[in-house]
A protein has these predicted regions:
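Amphipathic alpha-helical polymerization modules
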Residues: 1-246
Length: 246
């Protein structure tokens, strides 16, 4: 009986974790470059089937509890929107923009850049956007509207090339660890390579999820939690009957 009780309780715990991920995804729907978080629940229906088929609700000798796979990020391409803003750029294809973090390079899909008071190309958080030779500096007197960014990441101020965006790709994105809503750090075993992604000026890649997708997930999570709650109640009732409390 106890394994069945444990199974239903852990199933509820897993659905709570999935709910947290969906809530985070919904909170970041408007965040450029945000990558959707996913927690998969392993074999939920398989785990509950013995409870549903049991005549007394406690035939659970083979149940060990629902399990959740580790949270992971979905790095699929998000929708690209036109902004007509010169320093908004999006990547079409695999890869990341490289920016300077406090402890080394960080990687992002968000290309919402601007110039700081010193004329340095920076992110919304004020981190320097890295080029092939370091930060990208726009000459004095050049405005944002005069900056051109080519498809290969070359950055021009008028007719003068002032840098080229450092674009990075990883063979396995699972080596990346989130350090912010749209920033990632690479592990020591990560091997960065060049990418052939196309840079699109005047556009932004948005979060790679939608309110419809996440609301559908919420409905599914709610149904799974209700099923686990019913199983838990059935087991608890049977236990109480068998020990003479009812």
């Amino acid at each position: 009986m106890i394994p069945g009780l444990y199974s239903a309780a852990t199933a509820m715990d897993v659905t709570d974790r999935r709910h947290e991920m969906v809530a985070e995804n919904l909170a970041n729907l408007q965040m450029p470059g945000y990558r959707r978080r996913i927690v998969s629940q392993s074999n939920f229906d398989t785990l509950l089937r013995p409870l549903r088929q049991s005549t007394d609700g406690v035939d659970s000798s083979k149940l060990l509890g629902a399990t959740a796979d580790p949270a992971r990020y979905d790095f699929s391409q998000g929708n690209i929107q036109d902004t007509k803003r010169q320093l908004d750029v999006a990547l079409n294809g695999d890869g990341f923009f490289t920016v300077q973090g406090s402890s080394g390079p960080l990687y992002t899909r968000s290309g919402a850049f601007h110039l700081d008071p010193q004329g340095t190309l920076v992110t919304q958080d004020g981190l320097s956007v890295l080029g092939q030779g370091g930060s990208i500096q726009v000459p004095g007197g050049v405005t944002e509207s005069q900056v051109e960014i080519a498809a290969d990441g070359s950055v021009f101020a008028g007719d003068q090339q002032i840098g080229q965006l450092a674009l990075t790709r990883f063979a396995d994105n699972s080596v990346l660890t989130a350090v912010g809503a749209s920033l990632f750090a690479a592990g020591s075993n990560a091997v960065p390579t060049a990418t052939s992604a196309e840079v699109l000026q005047g556009r932004l890649e948005m979060a790679n999820t939608s309110s419809v997708t996440e609301l559908i997930n919420l409905i599914s999570i709610s149904r799974h939690r209700d099923a686990a709650q019913k199983a838990l109640n059935a087991i608890a009732d049977t236990i109480q009957k068998r020990i003479g409390l009812r």
